């Protein structure tokens, strides 16, 4: 089992920012079309994180032209160029699946306010 642990440790990324459910992210994804490759930005809020270690994933949801789009990314995937945290969300749940049914202003997530200490 120690061999698998060492392989997993070698595959971990160390440039992943700290984020949780409710945060708004910009995920820069490498898209390969034939011989060309480009970076596509997917911006939305985090519905939740699942798993641990190399197998950890997170789901990002956005509304594009009135249609909800969800995409699940492995945290340590090589196709992810970088992850940017745009805003921190103020939520009380680890999974925000209830947001799928909300529309309009009800689907807004409050922004977490940081007070200087």
UniProtKB/Swiss-Prot annotation:
NCBIfam families found in the cross-reference section: rplS_bact (TIGR01024)
One biological-process term from Gene Ontology?
translation
GO MF terms listed in the record are: structural constituent of ribosome
Species of provenance: Paenarthrobacter aurescens (strain TC1)
Described purpose of this protein according to its UniProt entry = This protein is located at the 30S-50S ribosomal subunit interface and may play a role in the structure and function of the aminoacyl-tRNA binding site.
Name the gene: rplS
The family assignment reads: Belongs to the bacterial ribosomal protein bL19 family.
User: HAMAP family this protein is in?
Assistant: Ribosomal_bL19
Protein's name according to its UniProt entry:
Large ribosomal subunit protein bL19
Sorted alphabetically, which InterPro entries does this protein's record hold? Ribosomal_bL19, Ribosomal_bL19_CS, Ribosomal_bL19_sf, Translation_prot_SH3-like_sf
Read off the Pfam families from this record: Ribosomal_L19
Keyword terms, alphabetized:
Ribonucleoprotein, Ribosomal protein
GO cellular-component term (any): cytosolic large ribosomal subunit
SUPFAM superfamilies linked:
Translation proteins SH3-like domain
């Amino acid at each position: 089992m120690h061999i698998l642990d060492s392989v997993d440790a070698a595959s971990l990324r160390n440039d992943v920012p700290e984020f949780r459910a409710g945060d708004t992210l910009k995920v820069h994804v490498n898209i390969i079309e034939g011989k060309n490759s480009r970076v596509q930005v997917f911006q939305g809020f985090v519905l939740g994180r699942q798993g641990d270690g190399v197998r950890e994933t997170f789901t990002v949801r956005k509304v594009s032209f009135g249609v909800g789009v969800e995409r699940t990314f492995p945290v340590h995937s090589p196709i992810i160029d970088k992850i940017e945290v745009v805003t921190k969300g103020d939520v009380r749940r680890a999974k925000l699946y209830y947001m799928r049914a909300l529309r309009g202003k009800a689907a807004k997530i409050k922004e977490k306010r940081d007070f200087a200490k």
